[in-house]
Each structure stands twice: as structure tokens, then as C-alpha cells.
Amino acid sequence: MKKLLYLSLAAFLMTSGSSMTFAAGGNSGGSSPAQDVKKCKKGEVLKKVGNVKKCVKVESGILPDDELYEQGRVLAKSGEYEWALQVLAAIENQNDPRVLNYTGYSNRKAGRLELGITYYRKALAIDPNFVLAREYLGEGYVAAGRIDLAQIELGEIKARAGTGSEEYRDLAKAIAAASN
């Protein structure tokens, strides 16, 4: 019975189009679909159905917003900015400060500095205490040569999260590097 099941599964996988499929477990090391999204083709996300992870075309509603956000965040942090923007755009709640923040991050890193800054400001208008958005906004200001504005964001992070926070340290480092 198991042999028939495996043969059926193998036949299905060979005829299921160009999307990649991954068995859960095994050598996955317990990684999440968000981490595994980079195994997919650009324009796809990883969807877990039962014990199988499958790459599917990214579109609104294909996954819960939190899962799309995590996959978009992973893509953005790994330098896949345009792909990340596709995933983030599929999120239904476009007013989530996290979504706005990583949309800003991806745009800034892709060379659209002013657009990135606009998204950080939108995120902060919703949640002024979102220190990661403040860090990224400050880094955007550094990239624009506006150290004065970056210093203001550094002060805001200090007031909200302290000088020991990663966001404070990272922005302080970016400001120091630009000032030398």
C-alpha cells in the first residue's frame, strides 16, 4: 500500500506543472515556509498543504496576511526586493505598519529612496512606537545625506527603546559611518 502511495505521489509530482514541491520534515531542519520561500521561483510563495510545501503563484488571499508578511520579510532581508514587493502587495491589509515598513525597505534598497521614505512615514503615522521603521527611516535619511533627520530618528528610538536596542545601535552605526 505504501509503495502504491509513493508511486502515486511521484507521478503526481512529475505532472504537477513547474511549481516545486517539498516534503515537510526530512532535511528541512524544521525551517518555516517563510525561510524556504527562496526555493520557489520569483513571483511564487510557499504554501503548506497538509505535510507538503508547494510553490504557488503569489496573489491576494493565497495565504493568511501574516504568512505572506513573513515570506515577504525574508525575501526583503535576503536582497530579493522586487519579489518581496510582489509578496507584500498581495497582503490584504495594506495599512499594517509591518507591511508598510518592509515595502519601504524593499523600495529603498532597490534604489527608490524617496518612495521608501514615504512608506516608513506611513508606518510611523499608524504606529509611532515602531522603532524598526524609525531605524530604517533614519538609514534612508543617511542615504539621502540628511544626517540631521537621521539624528532625530535616533533620538526617537532612544526615547522609545533605549540605547541598548538593536535599532538604536544599527542606526547610530550608520550615522557614524556617514559622518566619517
Each PLM stretch: what is its role?
Residues 20-70:
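Long, contiguous interaction/recruitment modules in multidomain scaffold/adaptor proteins
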Residues 61-94, 98, 107:
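Alpha-helical segment of the N-proximal tetratricopeptide repeat
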Residues 89-93, 124-125, 159-162:
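Conserved structural position within tetratricopeptide repeats
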Residues 96, 130, 164-165:
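Residue-level recognition of tetratricopeptide repeat
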Residues 99, 133, 167-168:
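TPR alpha-solenoid repeat register
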Residues 102, 136, 170-174:
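Canonical tetratricopeptide repeat
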